[in-house]
Design a protein with these regions (language model features):
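Active-site-proximal substrate-binding groove within the catalytic cores of carbohydrate-active enzymes
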Residues: 65-271, 287
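C-terminal beta-strand-rich structural cap/linker in extracellular carbohydrate-active enzymes
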Residues: 275-299
Length: 299
C-alpha cells in the first residue's frame, strides 16, 4: 500500500463519496475545496467492485474518477487546495510549498528559520500563490511549550515573525489553532500586518528572485519582481542573528524591467535613486535589526 490504508475510490463507496461531494457544492454554492488524502488511491485487488476490474486497473480507474471531479470543480470555478503537486494538471489551484510536519515540533526560533527555508526552496518552480505553508499556533505533533506560539501575546515577536515572512513572501499559511489573537495587542499586530500585505498585495503575489537562502548565520532574503506594476520590486531581508548587521547587497533588477535607474525606499521611507550597472544590478546598503527584518520597495 502506498498510503497505508486508503479505501478504494472505484468501489460503490467511492462512487457515492464523489456523488455527495458534487451534490454538496451544487446545493451550498461553496467555492473552496480542501482535499487532503485522495491522491490516486492504493492498489485494490478486489474483483467485485463496480468501477474497476481488478488489481491491474485499480489505480488508473481511481485516478480517472478523481480527475473527473477535479475538472468539474475547475470548470465550475471552485478553488481547490490539494497537497499533491500532480493534481495541478487536473484542476487543483494550490499545493503545499513543501515541509515536513514533524519539524513544526522544533523550538519557536528554529521554526521561524525553517519556515523561510521552506518558502525559499518551494518557490523556484512556481508562483508564491501556488503553494501554502504552515504555522502551528498550538502544539503540533510535540515539542511542548518551547514549540508553541500560544499564548500568542506572550510570544508576539515569534508570531509576528511568522506572519511577516509568510505574507512578505506571498505564500499563504494554514494557521493551525483556535484563534488568531488573544489580546487587544495581538489583534492590533495581526491587523497591522494584514493591512501592510494588502497595501502591497500585487507585488507580494508576484514572482520571486532568490537572493540568499536562510542558514541562521547571516542575512537571507527574497525579491518579488513584476515589470507591469508601479511597484516593480519588493525585497524582504531578514537577520536571524542576535546582533544588528549592516550589509551591502546587490539586487538583480533585470526582471523588474528597469534599465538605468531605480527608486528604492526602505520601510515606506523616502526613496533614493540608485543607478543600475551594465548587468542590471543595483547595490544597496541596509542595516537589519537583530532577530529582525527590513523591506524595500523598488520603482
Amino acid at each position: 500500500m502506498t498510503f497505508g490504508s486508503s479505501p478504494c475510490l472505484s468501489s460503490e463507496w467511492g462512487h457515492e463519496y464523489f456523488r455527495k461531494i458534487r451534490s454538496f457544492f451544487e446545493k451550498t454554492g461553496m467555492d473552496v475545496f480542501e482535499h487532503d488524502g485522495s491522491y490516486s488511491g492504493d492498489p485494490c485487488a478486489s474483483t467485485t467492485h463496480a468501477f474497476h476490474k481488478g488489481l491491474e486497473d485499480s489505480q488508473w480507474t481511481q485516478r480517472s474518477m478523481l480527475e473527473d471531479t477535479y475538472k468539474w470543480m475547475r470548470a465550475t470555478g471552485i478553488y481547490m487546495n490539494v497537497p499533491d503537486m500532480g493534481t495541478m494538471l487536473i484542476g487543483s489551484s494550490k499545493c503545499g510549498v513543501g515541509y515536513r510536519e514533524v519539524n513544526w515540533s522544533l523550538p519557536r526560533d528554529r521554526q521561524i528559520i525553517l519556515g523561510r527555508q521552506n518558502i525559499f526552496d518551494g518557490t523556484w518552480k512556481r508562483n508564491p500563490g501556488d503553494g501554502w505553508t504552515f504555522t502551528p499556533l498550538v502544539q503540533y505533533h510535540g515539542g511542548g511549550a518551547a514549540a508553541t506560539l500560544e499564548p500568542l501575546d506572550e510570544h508576539l515577536d515569534a508570531y509576528k515573525a511568522h506572519m511577516i515572512q509568510n505574507y512578505g513572501s506571498g505564500v499563504q499559511s494554514c494557521y493551525r489553532g483556535f484563534r488568531l489573537y488573544d489580546t487587544d495587542r495581538t489583534k492590533e499586530a495581526v491587523k497591522e500586518i494584514i493591512a501592510w500585505y494588502k497595501e502591497h498585495r500585487d507585488i507580494l503575489n508576484s514572482d520571486i528572485i532568490h537572493l540568499r537562502r536562510p542558514d541562521g548565520r547571516d542575512w537571507d532574503g527574497i525579491m518579488h519582481v513584476n515589470p507591469s506594476l508601479e511597484e516593480k520590486g519588493f525585497v524582504m531581508l531578514y537577520n536571524p542573528t542576535g546582533e544588528e548587521i549592516t550589509r551591502t547587497i546587490s539586487l538583480p533588477l533585470y526582471y523588474t524591467g528597469l534599465t538605468r535607474m531605480a527608486r528604492i525606499s526602505e520601510r515606506g521611507g523616502k526613496a533614493r535613486r540608485v543607478r543600475l550597472d551594465r548587468e542590471y544590478n543595483a547595490e544597496v546598503k541596509v542595516t537589519i535589526p537583530a532577530d529582525g527584518y527590513t523591506w524595500l520597495v523598488i520603482k
